[in-house]
Amino acid sequence: MSVYDLLIGQDHIVETLTAAVNAAASGEESQEMTHAWIFTGPPGSGRSSAAIAFAQALVCKQKGCGTCNECITAKSGAHPDIEILKSEGLSIKIDEIRELLTRTAWAPSMGGWRVVVMEDADRLTESAANALL
């Protein structure tokens, strides 16, 4: 079992994400994790599923085993170091981003990473996007 099991037919994506998790876990300065990843594609292509699986793998001590406490907690949506931001209306407003930035400044609770998956980032208002930058 793996956190990537739901990414059927996306072997090249799984390889890329697995390599990134392994590189980040190596601790080598030349392999540091980038501050952001963008998952693009048409609706139904698995963007959110891939991003969430990647987040789960980052917080897992076994790099995405799918069976440990971190993976189970992340899969249930209750992991304190993974936050999924979805637009509640037609747009993501600056107040939501300001609250998010406050929370993301905290150190990770259970692992080495604090991960935010932002669904529908194209719905950010201009001021919200600027605050995020």
What does each model-identified segment do?
Residues 1-127:
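P-loop/Walker A NTP-binding region and its immediately flanking N-terminal helices
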